[in-house]
């Protein structure tokens, strides 16, 4: 897995395109509560339990999610 590079978000709000890039890269990251322009990006553990979630428009959403991606994210192979 040394050739796999994590996909991260900008530290602030993020776009749907950025969220889709992350959900494509990680098996345990999903888009939920989709309201069109606003949605939550959710990280779940291997058992399906919620680890963290943020609305895409929150001022520090990406920063919070990136820390959980680093520790909880499961990259697709």
Curated annotation (Swiss-Prot):
It comes from the Bacteria. SUPFAM superfamilies: YcfA/nrd intein domain. InterPro entries: DUF905, YkfF-like_sf. Pfam families: DUF905. Belongs to the UPF0401 family. This is UPF0401 protein UTI89_C4989. It comes from Escherichia coli (strain UTI89 / UPEC). The lineage of its organism: Bacteria, Pseudomonadati, Pseudomonadota, Gammaproteobacteria, Enterobacterales.
């Amino acid at each position: 897995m040394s050739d796999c590079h994590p996909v991260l978000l900008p530290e602030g709000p993020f776009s749907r395109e950025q969220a889709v890039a992350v959900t494509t890269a990680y098996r345990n990251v999903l888009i939920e509560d989709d309201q069109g322009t606003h949605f939550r990006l959710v990280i779940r553990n291997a058992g399906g339990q919620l680890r963290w979630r943020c609305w895409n428009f929150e001022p520090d959403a990406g920063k919070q999610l990136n820390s959980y991606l680093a520790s909880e994210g499961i990259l697709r192979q």
